[in-house]
Amino acid sequence: MSRICIIRGTMPHKGRRIHRSGLAKKKGGIGRHVTKTVNRTVFPNLQEKRIWVPELGQFVKMKISAKALRTINKNGAYNTLKKVGLL
């Protein structure tokens, strides 16, 4: 399965990890210096959930991000799914 949230459309994107060396100025050094940057992939926090939709009277199984779960808790499952176009 793809790593995409069906509510928000969140998907993996590229990021960087920065490697630093040296002692911080606060600790008496001359400062931290960037020695290398490494490409990495940042993944969304996806959860596979069974959401109860009272209007339909059944569970709907979906792969959603943690932020989308908060949206469902705030606006209700039926309204959120209808707005996205899944119902």
Curated annotation (Swiss-Prot):
GO BP term, pick one: translation
Keywords: Ribonucleoprotein, Ribosomal protein
Cellular compartments per GO CC: ribonucleoprotein complex; ribosome
A GO molecular-function annotation: structural constituent of ribosome
InterPro entries assigned to the protein according to its UniProt record, in alphabetical order: Ribosomal_bL28, Ribosomal_bL28/bL31-like_sf, Ribosomal_bL28_bact-type, Ribosomal_bL28_sf
Any single Pfam family the record assigns to this protein: Ribosomal_L28
Family recorded in the similarity comment: Belongs to the bacterial ribosomal protein bL28 family.
Official protein name in the record: Large ribosomal subunit protein bL28
Gene: rpmB
